[in-house]
Amino acid sequence: MERGVSYYLWIPFKFIHQTFGSLLLKLLGLRSPSDHSFPEDGEEEVKVVEVSSRGLPGKKNVLKKSRESSGKPGGTNKKPF
């Protein structure tokens, strides 16, 4: 190994601990203390909400710009003589 070069090995200890704990739980039927921190499949509460675009009110009061506008600010829309 060259001088100044070092190699690091990252070991996911928490993942390994949870994996072995779940294997022991399945094999031996024992409850481990780590079970209290994570909910099981049956304990997780899920709320399902159905959303539909048809339930939304449509835009009925849409302001339309008059075609007779001159485009200048401050004026009223009057027909030219």
From Swiss-Prot:
Q: Name one GO biological process term.
A: response to jasmonic acid
Tell whether RNA-binding is among the UniProt keywords. Answer: no
Site (Required for ligand-receptor interaction): which residue positions? 71
Q: Which residues form the propeptide?
A: 1-54
Alphabetical UniProt keywords: Plant defense
One Pfam entry name: Pep1_7
Q: Which residues form the signal peptide?
A: none
* Similarity comment text for this entry: Belongs to the brassicaceae elicitor peptide family.
- Summarize the protein's role: Elicitor of plant defense.
Name of protein: Elicitor peptide 4
Kindly list the organism's lineage.
Eukaryota, Viridiplantae, Streptophyta, Embryophyta, Tracheophyta
